[in-house]
């Protein structure tokens, strides 16, 4: 589509010519190169989440990068030395899948997309330091992924284990828990995730669970509350107790975790997850019939995903394991069952069931005629569902406990009953006493539990960082020496990358079979690659020393620049990327490589760009960024993104007006053609009214910008443009010093959002250098004091007139002026003025009576 030049009077604002000229200047001069370490100015590290190169930039990128660039440009205007780098998160499944589909090497697809995105970024006028550009798929980068893995392996933070994992049957690879969506599907392929038992690599993120929760307090006020809440919930720290249950025929007790040890007297059976190691062990000594039933039940369980197993409205299923456990507080023998509503990775894979006070346990108890005992009087009216059982020894029949079999659990707090010495205590005192008793008897202890699980990083795909481990003939793990890094990916020629349920690297025999780095004996490389979230967990540190061939980053550079002052990106990364980055930063702190424990001091999440209320996509005819820039100009798109509303809100492209933004930019740009004064003119000689508007803007805009109220600042810039135009057209004209001063301020403000237009305005104003480094001017305090105010004149309680008066006017003078106004004369004609109250300089109140 042909580009549209706004149809307004005067000179032609040709955004295409302006873009071509300044793009060439920026490419030649690289003005946003980060100054070296000798620069003594204060520093700011501003970073946008780097993109995955799956194609050209889209409208979502356009919003995020426009906002991040505005932040970087603002701090440059404030005199800071700003680091604002860019790179590509270039490993990952989309590249591998595209390569399989096209029969090409993933490198070819990836780097072609990078070049496309890079050119679009440059066209978009983003103020990146291109000399620090990185790609996570470069061996020079992933070498340091491998180094970090080895450091963690040395400390026991990287380990292998055999366990049930999330398996994507379409992409044929494992997924971390964080990569499984709430509906049980893969966040990549959309396939329903199943469980599969594999030996995989994990990182011990759970060792850092408490620090990951507690340190969120440091981020209050600078991170979105929603993200902090999401991380707290995902880590899922629970405070309670571990309780040891002796199980018949087992030497070691079974330990369960509970947040309600006060309800132990109400535990009437135990549940173990059928796919847990504990269940397999317990059933081993059972009868042939029990073992056969268990095998069938386990197979049925494995066909379910976690969502299906956890849903509350699904009928409960389970089988008895033929074992009993001893309740440690009352000595009762309780049956042990396997039930699929319990997941193997929760706690120890076993729980005590308190059906009176947990709905899932109650549903299970009702399904299998298991006993129910109420041990907390919640002070709610007890319905026919459950009634309190007197302490007379034996439990009554289920029918008596649950009349009508309409069980409703009582999960609330209250006074304990049916609990021996705990009777009458409320929740917290009861919990304290139970834990004291358990600890004294060696049957339990205070404990914490976490929803968070260790980070599974193995992937059975090609396009990722090879794991730097080899195995000798006995299967022992051997670390690849650091001086042999990077372990490079092999060439794909002749290699079938199609997913087969195991890593395609295993088929690259020349690459896989290597001499042991210990003694030269035959050894085998680990064929898996790392989760690509490993790449992005620390990339922001590599930007500090991108060309250092001897270390991942220079600690001196980290001290100089890190942590990041402002991170900008989507809320979809709240758990995965942001949590992993926080974890890796704490690991690096413990290893002595950094002096801080949080990577991102402040976080800004932008909303989504929608079309007609729906998320944009190519398949649904989403808006094409390139076409929009062709039609309206880069600056109009950037300005529209920033002006649409608060950054965290979604933008519906059908509801905004890039053409309106283009017209405003043309109007602002055209001001420069009406200015006849020289750059050296003395500002103080200019029109005072316009100077007051200008300096009020200079004083108030920084606070708004630092609060990300970009839309408000743009609205105020528009008001300033209107005031300038009025001063030019109605006097004192384009030669006035205040007109030049205000127009230069407009150019500086627009440099944050519309850099092409701003640079051209600056040049047309006769200024040297780039407007991006002009500096935010300081407001003159004397121009911020109001010289006039609006005085309201009331007669008998009604506003009859208004006066623009000197802010320092006296009461007598104000009263005299008020009496002479037309409104007062008309309202008091034929009446007697009884009383006049003056509150100079703002109010005159006159009271009258009829003759």
UniProtKB/Swiss-Prot annotation:
Reaction equations catalysed: tRNA(Leu) + L-leucine + ATP = L-leucyl-tRNA(Leu) + AMP + diphosphate
Family: Belongs to the class-I aminoacyl-tRNA synthetase family.
Residue ranges annotated as motif 'HIGH' region: 51-61
PROSITE patterns hit by this protein: AA_TRNA_LIGASE_I
SUPFAM superfamilies: Anticodon-binding domain of a subclass of class I aminoacyl-tRNA synthetases, Nucleotidylyl transferase, ValRS/IleRS/LeuRS editing domain
One function term, GO molecular function aspect: ATP binding
Major localisation: cytoplasm
Subcellular compartments: Cytoplasm
Protein name (Swiss-Prot/TrEMBL): Leucine--tRNA ligase
EC number: 6.1.1.4
Pfam families in the cross-refs: Anticodon_1, tRNA-synt_1, tRNA-synt_1_2
GO cellular component: cytosol
HAMAP family, A to Z: Leu_tRNA_synth_B
Enzyme class: ligase
Top-rank taxon, per record: Bacteria
Family annotation (InterPro entries): aa-tRNA-synth_I_CS (IPR001412), aa-tRNA-synth_Ia (IPR002300), Leu-tRNA-ligase (IPR002302), Leu_tRNA-synth_edit (IPR025709), M/V/L/I-tRNA-synth_anticd-bd (IPR013155), Rossmann-like_a/b/a_fold (IPR014729), tRNAsynth_Ia_anticodon-bd (IPR009080), Val/Leu/Ile-tRNA-synth_edit (IPR009008)
């Amino acid at each position: 589509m042909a580009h549209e030049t706004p149809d307004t009077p005067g000179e032609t604002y040709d955004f295409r010519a302006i873009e071509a000229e300044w793009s060439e200047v920026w490419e030649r001069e690289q003005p946003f190169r980060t100054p070296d370490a000798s620069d003594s100015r204060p520093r700011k590290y501003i970073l946008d989440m780097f993109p995955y190169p799956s194609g050209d930039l889209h409208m979502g990128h356009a919003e995020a990068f426009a906002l991040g660039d505005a932040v970087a440009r603002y701090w440059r205007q404030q005199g800071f030395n700003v680091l604002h780098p860019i790179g590509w998160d270039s490993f990952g499944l989309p590249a591998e899948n595209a390569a399989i589909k096209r029969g090409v090497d993933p490198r070819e697809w990836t780097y072609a997309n990078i070049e496309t995105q890079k050119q679009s970024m440059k066209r978009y006028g983003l103020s990146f330091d291109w000399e620090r550009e990185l790609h996570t798929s470069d061996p020079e980068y992933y070498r340091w992924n491998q180094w970090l893995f080895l450091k963690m392996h040395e400390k026991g933070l990287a380990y292998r284990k055999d366990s049930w994992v999330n398996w994507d049957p379409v992409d044929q690879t494992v997924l971390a828990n964080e990569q499984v969506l709430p509906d049980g599907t893969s966040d990549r392929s959309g396939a329903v995730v199943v469980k599969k038992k594999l030996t995989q690599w994990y990182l011990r993120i759970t060792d850092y669970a408490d620090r990951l929760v507690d340190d969120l307090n440091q981020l209050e006020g600078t991170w979105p509350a929603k993200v902090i809440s999401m991380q707290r919930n995902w880590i899922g720290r629970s405070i309670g107790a571990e309780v040891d249950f002796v199980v018949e025929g087992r030497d070691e007790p079974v330990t369960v975790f509970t947040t309600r040890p006060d309800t132990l007297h109400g535990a009437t059976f135990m549940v173990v997850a059928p796919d847990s190691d504990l269940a397999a062990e317990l059933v081993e000594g059972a009868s042939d019939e029990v073992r056969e039933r268990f095998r069938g039940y386990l197979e049925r369980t494995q066909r379910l995903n976690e969502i299906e197993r956890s849903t509350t409205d699904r009928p409960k299923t389970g089988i008895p394991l033929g074992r009993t456990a001893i309740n440690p507080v009352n000595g009762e023998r309780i049956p042990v069952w396997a039930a699929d509503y319990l997941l193997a990775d929760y706690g120890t894979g076993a729980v005590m069931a308190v059906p009176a006070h947990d709905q899932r346990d109650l549903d299970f108890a009702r399904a299998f005629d298991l006993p129910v005992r109420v041990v907390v009087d919640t002070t709610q009216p007890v319905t026919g569902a459950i009634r309190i059982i007197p302490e007379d020894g034996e439990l009554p029949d289920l029918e008596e406990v649950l009349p009508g079999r309409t069980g409703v659990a009582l999960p609330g707090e209250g006074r304990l009953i049916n609990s021996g010495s705990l009777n009458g205590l409320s929740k917290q005192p009861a919990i304290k006493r139970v834990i004291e008793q358990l600890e004294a008897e060696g049957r339990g202890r205070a404990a914490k539990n976490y929803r968070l699980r260790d980070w599974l990083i193995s992937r059975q795909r090609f396009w990722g960082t090879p794991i730097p481990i080899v195995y000798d003939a006995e299967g022992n793990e051997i670390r690849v020496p650091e001086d042999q890094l990077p372990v490079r990916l092999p060439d794909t020629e002749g290699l079938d990358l199609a997913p087969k349920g195991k890593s395609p690297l295993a088929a690259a025999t020349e690459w896989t079979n290597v001499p042991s780095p210990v003694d030269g004996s035959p050894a085998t490389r680990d064929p898996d690659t790392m989760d690509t979230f490993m790449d992005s967990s620390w990339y922001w540190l590599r930007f500090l020393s991108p060309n250092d061939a001897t270390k991942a980053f220079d600690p001196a550079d980290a001290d100089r620049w890190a942590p990041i002052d402002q991170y900008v990106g989507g809320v979809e990364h709240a758990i995965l990327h942001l949590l992993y980055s926080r974890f890796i930063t704490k690991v690096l702190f413990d290893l002595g490589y950094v002096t801080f424990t949080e990577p991102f001091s402040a976080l800004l999440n932008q909303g989504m760009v929608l079309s007609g209320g729906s998320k944009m996509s190519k398949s649904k005819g989403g808006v094409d960024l390139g076409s929009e820039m062709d039609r309206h100009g880069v600056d109009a798109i950037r300005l529209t993104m920033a002006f649409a509303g608060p950054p965290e809100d979604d933008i519906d492209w059908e509801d905004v007006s890039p053409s309106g933004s283009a017209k405003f930019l043309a109007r602002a740009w055209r001001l420069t053609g009406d200015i006849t004064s020289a750059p050296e003119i003395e500002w103080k000689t200019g029109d005072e009214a316009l100077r007051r508007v200008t300096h009020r803007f200079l004083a108030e805009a920084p606070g708004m910008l630092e609060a990300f109220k970009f839309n408000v600042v743009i609205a105020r810039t528009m008001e300033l443009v209107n005031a300038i135009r009025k001063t030019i057209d109605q006097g004192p004209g384009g030669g006035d010093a205040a007109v030049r001063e205000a127009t230069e301020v407009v150019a500086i403000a627009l440099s944050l959002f519309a850099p092409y237009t701003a640079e051209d305005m600056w040049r047309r104003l006769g200024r040297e250098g780039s407007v991006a480094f002009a500096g935010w001017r300081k407001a003159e305090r004397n121009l911020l004091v109001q010289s006039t105010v609006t005085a309201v004149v009331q007669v008998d309680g009604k506003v009859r007139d208004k006066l623009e008066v000197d802010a320092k006017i006296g009461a007598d003078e104000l009263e005299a002026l008020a009496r002479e106004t037309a409104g007062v004369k008309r309202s008091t004609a034929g009446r007697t003025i009884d009383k006049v109250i003056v509150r100079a300089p703002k109010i005159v109140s006159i009271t009258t009576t009829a003759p």
